[in-house]
Amino acid sequence: MPRYTEVRADGFVFLFAHDDDAPELLHIYARHLTTIEDALRVWFDSNVEDIWDKEHNRFEVQNDTHLLLWNWLTVGERVLIISCMTRED
């Protein structure tokens, strides 16, 4: 089982980690019941702004429904999706 699933969208490569306890599932689904589509919807939402979380060395971005935690692996190209959750979580 691969550690990450790679998804290409609009010139970026997104890496989604598989869950440690359930490696057949993505972490975002196993822990928060969110999907790749949910994460990409937040990422590409032109009405949101990325905020740098200095304490945790990651970016946060949220729309009306979800919070996305992410960081660059290669600036402008490769994105590590740390987590994605509904705002109710």
Question: Regions from the language model: what does each represent?
Answer:
Residues 1-89:
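Ribonuclease/tRNase effector modules and their secretory precursors
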